[in-house]
């Protein structure tokens, strides 16, 4: 059967190259706006949006005086992409290391999400992942 529609992209590999902090081009552009109160990142699937959020959230926690980060995702399966991630090995100043107890998107996580959320707010932990 012939292809009726064929789409090709100019694949240069540029989007997969990383800088000295381990960021792809799109992540670097997002990180440049890290001090913004609101930030919308629009990019294709699997382009590194979750990791871009990790970079920005860690900067807000370490350098901007923010005490807690709540990552609210539209569905539980997306929450899995926010598991612990070694970012230091690629040059970033910190690793993404949320406490498993406060990733409310993983199987077997806290039965009462409200209780877990309230516990997080009163704890010293700085990262919570949940659905919105």
What do the PLM-derived regions correspond to, one by one?
Residues 2-42:
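Conserved pre-motif I regulatory segment
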Residues 77-110:
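Conserved helix-turn-beta segment of the N-terminal RecA-like "Helicase ATP-binding" lobe
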Residues 121-132:
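Conserved two-lobed SF2 helicase motor
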Residues 113-117:
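Conserved helicase ATPase core of P-loop NTP-dependent helicases/translocases
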Residues 36-56:
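Walker A/P-loop
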Residues 51-54, 61, 65-89, 131-132:
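Conserved Walker A/P-loop ATP-binding site and its immediately adjacent core
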Residues 38-40, 68-70, 125-127:
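Residue-level preference for the first positions of well-ordered beta-strands
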Residues 62-64, 119-123:
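Conserved catalytic network of the ASCE P-loop NTPase/AAA+ motor domain
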